[in-house]
Amino acid sequence: MKAEWNTFPHLCHTPNGDISIRVYCYLPKGQTNELPILFYVHGLGGGNKDKGNGAEWLSTFAEEHHHVIVAPAFPRDEFPSEFYQLGTISASMDSYVPVAEEFWIYNNIEQLFDRVKGMLASKCETYKIFGHSAGGQFVHRFLNAMPDARVSRAVAANPGSWTFPVADGKIDDTGNVYGWPATVKDTPLADDRHLKSFFARKMLVELGEADIKSLKETYATGSGGTTFMNLPGMCAQGDCRFDRGMTYWKRAHEYAASRGFACNWELLRVPEVAHEGKKMFAAAIDWLLSD
């Protein structure tokens, strides 16, 4: 591969058959086999855009901070919400209907890491991952679902919904109990192995303090296949992305403490930034580089 944007196909195994996607990979100038690898996971619709719609600032980051960028593109028409944001863990968007683990979309990240390592003869043993909006939904569910994933640092920025890592299904103090996709209750992700691994991750919960547009209004009609965003368990998280993120942060820490699980997550509140992927990425750079 050349020192610029490269692209190659990748075959995803899904419950609906194999689907070919494009993967974009940026190589900075110079020797790349010892450089860290960063996965960029696009937001909703980003899979229909060149390099997930972040080509300019991702390549600038790669050159300035000497990283290889890997950006898989999952087209929205072939990877609707239950495939992309929810990871194909369940065959339903409003309850848990088991899907074989071999079809979970998250497997593709690990497969792509191995492919890129092979292409570059890379010495990297781990990788970093950043996702904004729907990409942030992807990232935090990916970490919960894949306890053996070789991730060193992960950023979940401004997700519109969260799956709470609480086996009891309780999001708040009301006593109401919610299942998938609002929580991991009664799913494989609720066992101690998955939860301990997830809480132990170096994950940044990154929230734009100005990302306060009402999601109940935005997704009132379930536009774009996002009906799950206004399920009761999602609405219980809050009315806007910032509120939902803060509810997630608080409840997850309470639950981890109650179970005696160590939690290595960090919270970054970004002032005066709304639903803006470029600005959120810029605000997370220091944390991504802090190893």
Question: Which residues fall in each region the model found?
Answer:
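Short substrate-entry loop that stabilizes the transition state in hydrolases
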Residues: 31-35, 40-80, 163-164, 213-215
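Alpha/beta-hydrolase active-site loop
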Residues: 89-120, 127
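Conserved alpha/beta-hydrolase "nucleophile elbow" surrounding the catalytic nucleophile
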Residues: 42, 131-133
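C-terminal catalytic histidine-bearing segment of alpha/beta-hydrolase fold enzymes
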Residues: 3-6, 206, 218-233, 243-291
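Alpha/beta-hydrolase
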Residues: 39-41, 157, 270
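Short amphipathic alpha-helices and their capping/turn segments at secondary-structure boundaries
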Residues: 25-29, 58-60, 186-204, 285-288
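A domain-start/cap signature at the N-terminus of enzymes
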Residues: 1-37, 50, 64-68, 94, ...
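The feature captures the conserved acid-bearing segment of alpha/beta-hydrolase catalytic domains
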Residues: 152-254
